[in-house]
């Protein structure tokens, strides 16, 4: 925070047999020097009707705390939600443009399962990264598993909103040349193997 204090946010899970599931978000102060949690853990946000409130993170901007959460699970109901408050103690107000992002109502969108966003900005230009997947057929298998994409956002009446005015992500987004700095190096290679042999171990990975 502005005063140098740190906080740890986490999803709360309800293990009771009669009502198992996600139960909102908790916050606790983190002592950076001692590298441990201190003080009382507080349950401070219950989530939305989309359910499965997880992956919480907070941005402070213009005197507001913005709580960005993943919602709906990581399947085809995946979404991102935003709430804000003047204090970490609340009260928290859900965005009128809820959800910030989802494709649960847009099965033809190429970036399915979109949600779990993270804010970033370059000067006055604001963006969110997102988790998504590209199915081979409508709502079918996604052979590349989870992928990462970028969307441009605008601030409308103090709320973040996708720049296209909807909550549906776009496949192509224009950004300034200096916004994204490549960090990958060229690791291309040519591999030759016989059709009746096993794939090289470098071709194998866990399915996500």
Give the label of every model feature segment:
Residues 1-208:
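Carbohydrate-active catalytic/glycan-binding domains of CAZyme proteins
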């Amino acid at each position: 925070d502005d005063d140098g204090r740190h906080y740890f946010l986490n999803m709360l899970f309800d293990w009771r047999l009669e009502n198992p599931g996600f139960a909102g978000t908790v916050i606790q102060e983190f002592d950076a020097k001692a590298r441990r949690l201190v003080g009382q853990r507080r349950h401070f946000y219950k989530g939305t009707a989309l359910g499965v409130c997880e992956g919480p993170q907070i941005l402070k901007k213009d005197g507001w705390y913005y709580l960005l959460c993943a919602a709906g699970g990581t399947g085809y109901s995946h979404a991102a939600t935003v709430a804000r408050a003047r204090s970490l103690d609340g009260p928290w107000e859900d965005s009128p443009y809820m959800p910030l992002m989802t494709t649960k109502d847009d099965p033809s969108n190429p970036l399915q399962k979109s949600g779990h966003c993270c804010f970033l900005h370059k000067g006055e230009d604001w963006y969110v990264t997102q988790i998504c997947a590209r199915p081979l057929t409508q709502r079918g298998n996604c052979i590349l598993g989870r992928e990462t994409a970028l969307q441009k956002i605008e601030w409308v009446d103090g709320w973040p909103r996708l720049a296209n005015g909807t909550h549906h992500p776009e496949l192509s987004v224009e950004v300034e040349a200096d916004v994204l700095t490549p960090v990958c190096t060229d690791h291309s290679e040519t591999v030759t193997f016989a059709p009746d042999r096993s794939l090289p171990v470098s071709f194998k990975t866990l399915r996500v």
